[in-house]
Amino acid sequence: MAIEKTNRINALFDFYEPLLTPKQMTYIGLYYRDDYSLGEIAENYEVSRQAVYDNIRRTEKILEEYESKLHLYRNFQLQSEELDNLLKYVEENYAYDKELLTRINRLESLEE
């Protein structure tokens, strides 16, 4: 499993988790966040590996569909990038303005 895919699914899961069913949340959470294998999940929930695999793949598609319509993750990335650019600019050009730096740092902490 590629690290980029894992990171993306985890990020999408963070944004869209409340829109998933309890089973989808459980399987995706165990597989991507907790690094369980398909076999471990199947054993814990007394279902086949194929059932777990199918559920996870369907849920990945659902998460991608939500993102294609709502763009929450993309917008978060763009806002983060712009905030980083703003902070860099202020540090380079207005380093003496402690109030401005403080306010930007507060904005950054709101993202977390």
Curated annotation (Swiss-Prot):
Q: Which InterPro entries match?
A: RNA_pol_sigma_r3/r4-like (IPR013324), UPF0122 (IPR007394), UPF0122_fam_protein (IPR054831), WH-like_DNA-bd_sf (IPR036388)
List the Gene3D superfamilies. Answer: Winged helix-like DNA-binding domain superfamily/Winged helix DNA-binding domain
Q: Which domain of life is it from?
A: Bacteria
**Assigned protein family:** Belongs to the UPF0122 family.
Q: What does this protein do?
A: Might take part in the signal recognition particle (SRP) pathway. This is inferred from the conservation of its genetic proximity to ftsY/ffh. May be a regulatory protein.
Q: Write down the PANTHER family for this protein, in alphabetical order.
A: UPF0122 PROTEIN CBO2450/CLC_2298 (PTHR40083), UPF0122 PROTEIN YLXM (PTHR40083:SF1)
Q: Could you identify this protein by its name?
A: UPF0122 protein LSL_0628
Organism the protein comes from: Ligilactobacillus salivarius (strain UCC118)
